[in-house]
């Protein structure tokens, strides 16, 4: 482990929760002057931290613990029947790793995705500046995985490649291709990629029991949840 005790953290003032509107949220951030070291990041991911843009953070709410960090142990994952169908349905896609960059092709897909799937969220309306600040960061461990069908961009999975696993930062995809279940396929592909690179887990961010948008995360079994500072397996 790195010397985490030497790190500084800052908590925000309470603000509206983007997942549970009736709750007030507080977020704990790693000191932004701290260099984004991949080993520090990996250790903090074990403690439930996530990356957004140039910041590492985790919920630090006074009266709520609904946001539960979740990860899939890659070597123990077994796809169910529906997931095997999704893998088969998308076997015609090719996946290529690219460095983070702003491209109109990326942004147009991102824009359509946000406008179609998340028009009620705090990322709407999408803008080029928002896209760049959120996703296009010059970090050596960050990758854009492009999913293409005969050259056509179908999805982009933004991932951080850490010593202890793949951290799924964000995925956006073609909103008119419901039959393919591209979001779910991207997670299945990341599990396969983690195995290929001998990585322990795929970090999915936070699972919230009472948030329907988060339900998909517990469809991948077994899954591990960080409860009382311990990773607990949910089979």
From Swiss-Prot:
<dbReference type="InterPro" id="IPR030700">
    <property type="entry name" value="N-end_Aminoacyl_Trfase"/>
</dbReference>
<keyword id="KW-0012">Acyltransferase</keyword>
<keyword id="KW-0963">Cytoplasm</keyword>
<dbReference type="InterPro" id="IPR017138">
    <property type="entry name" value="Asp_Glu_LeuTrfase"/>
</dbReference>
<dbReference type="GO" id="GO:0004057">
    <property type="term" value="F:arginyl-tRNA--protein transferase activity"/>
</dbReference>
<dbReference type="GO" id="GO:0005737">
    <property type="term" value="C:cytoplasm"/>
</dbReference>
<protein>
    <recommendedName>
        <fullName>Aspartate/glutamate leucyltransferase</fullName>
        <ecNumber>2.3.2.29</ecNumber>
    </recommendedName>
</protein>
<dbReference type="Pfam" id="PF04377">
    <property type="entry name" value="ATE_C"/>
</dbReference>
<comment type="function">
    <text>Functions in the N-end rule pathway of protein degradation where it conjugates Leu from its aminoacyl-tRNA to the N-termini of proteins containing an N-terminal aspartate or glutamate.</text>
</comment>
<dbReference type="InterPro" id="IPR007471">
    <property type="entry name" value="N-end_Aminoacyl_Trfase_N"/>
</dbReference>
<dbReference type="InterPro" id="IPR007472">
    <property type="entry name" value="N-end_Aminoacyl_Trfase_C"/>
</dbReference>
<dbReference type="GO" id="GO:0008914">
    <property type="term" value="F:leucyl-tRNA--protein transferase activity"/>
</dbReference>
<dbReference type="Pfam" id="PF04376">
    <property type="entry name" value="ATE_N"/>
</dbReference>
<keyword id="KW-0808">Transferase</keyword>
<comment type="similarity">
    <text>Belongs to the R-transferase family. Bpt subfamily.</text>
</comment>
<dbReference type="GO" id="GO:0071596">
    <property type="term" value="P:ubiquitin-dependent protein catabolic process via the N-end rule pathway"/>
</dbReference>
<dbReference type="InterPro" id="IPR016181">
    <property type="entry name" value="Acyl_CoA_acyltransferase"/>
</dbReference>
């Amino acid at each position: 482990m790195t010397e985490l005790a030497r790190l500084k953290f800052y908590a925000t003032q309470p603000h509206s929760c983007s997942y549970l509107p009736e709750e007030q949220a507080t977020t704990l951030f790693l000191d932004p002057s701290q260099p984004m070291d991949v080993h520090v990041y990996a250790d903090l991911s074990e403690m439930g931290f996530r990356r957004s843009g140039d910041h590492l953070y985790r919920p630090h709410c006074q009266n709520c613990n609904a946001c539960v960090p979740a990860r899939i142990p890659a070597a123990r994952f077994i796809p169910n029947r529906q997931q095997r169908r999704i893998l088969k349905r998308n076997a015609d896609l090719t996946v290529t790793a690219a460095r983070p960059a702003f491209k109109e092709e990326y942004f147009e897909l991102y824009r359509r995705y946000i406008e179609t799937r998340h028009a009620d969220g705090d990322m709407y309306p999408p803008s080029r500046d928002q896209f760049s600040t959120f996703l296009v960061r010059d970090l050596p461990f960050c990758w854009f995985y492009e999913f293409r069908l005969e050259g056509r961009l179908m999805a982009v999975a933004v991932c951080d490649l850490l010593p202890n696993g793949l951290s799924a930062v964000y995925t956006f995809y073609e909103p008119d291709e419901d039959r393919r279940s591209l979001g779910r396929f991207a997670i299945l592909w990341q599990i396969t990629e983690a195995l290929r690179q001998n990585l322990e887990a795929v970090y999915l961010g936070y699972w919230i029991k009472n948030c329907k948008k988060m339900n998909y995360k517990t469809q991948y079994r077994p899954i591990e949840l960080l409860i009382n500072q311990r990773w607990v397996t949910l089979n």
